[in-house]
Amino acid sequence: MSIHIGAKEGQIAETILLPGDPLRAKFIAETFLENPVCYNEVRGMLGYTGTYKGKRISVQGTGMGVPSISIYVNELIRDYGVKNLIRVGTAGGMQEDIKVRDLVLAMSSHTDSAINKVRFNGLDFAPTASFKLLKAAYDTAVEKGYSPKVGSVFTADSFYNDNPEAWKQWAKFGTLAVEMETAALYTLAAKYGVNALTILTISDHLITAEETTSEERQTTFTKMMEVALDAAITL
């Protein structure tokens, strides 16, 4: 056991999906995995391990934001030996050619979080995806007939920004979407020498104001789940 994860040694697979919402973790496990076993209920952050097309896969909720995902990613890698981490989450679209429910593969992530400023003594660090995972997910999505968008995302430290126009500066530089975890995931993957990728579904749009319901976000964004799982079995 680690501080925040109740699993015993060997209960978590080397490849894991990381939804922010623990109920999405439950949905993925019950919908896609064979013989899923719940290994974690600590703080309601559900975690499961099962098999997908013969490969052992885990899925673990992480909560929202850089501090929360950092807790789970640190413990999964350090205490349980996880090697491949795929975040499956939602994001707000920031470009006109990106539509609600589109798939986004995050090649890199900007952030306003100070976590890396502290870590690198005021210097910048460029958090990027693992090419192996990025290519596997892109190829999988294309084979399925999807049209994934690939590019940078913005990891925000605050959901309710006091400056509602702040996102426009990032959009001006080609940023595809805003979310709250990827910069931390990619930084920790680099620190520990493991593989990480974020696959996002656009759940709302900062330009058009279109949005989806909480129920849709929990149970209907299955394209990204299928892409993540089918990419995972190629590793």
Swiss-Prot record:
Organism annotation: Clostridium perfringens (strain SM101 / Type A)
Annotated site location: Important for catalytic activity: 217
Any Gene Ontology biological process: purine nucleoside catabolic process
Subunit-level organization: Homohexamer; trimer of homodimers.
Enzyme nomenclature, EC number: 2.4.2.1
Protein name: Purine nucleoside phosphorylase DeoD-type
Active-site residues, record numbering mapped to chain: 204
A single GO cellular-component term on record: cytosol
Role summary: Catalyzes the reversible phosphorolytic breakdown of the N-glycosidic bond in the beta-(deoxy)ribonucleoside molecules, with the formation of the corresponding free purine bases and pentose-1-phosphate.
Positions that bind phosphate: 20, 24, 43, 87-90
Family: Belongs to the PNP/UDP phosphorylase family.
Entry keyword annotation includes Cell inner membrane: no
Record-linked PANTHER family: FI09636P-RELATED, URIDINE PHOSPHORYLASE
Phylogenetic lineage: Bacteria, Bacillati, Bacillota, Clostridia, Eubacteriales
SUPFAM superfamilies: Purine and uridine phosphorylases
Residues given in the record as a purine D-ribonucleoside binding sites: 4, 179-181, 203-204
Alphabetic keyword roster: Glycosyltransferase, Transferase
Keyword Phosphoprotein: no
Recorded superkingdom: Bacteria
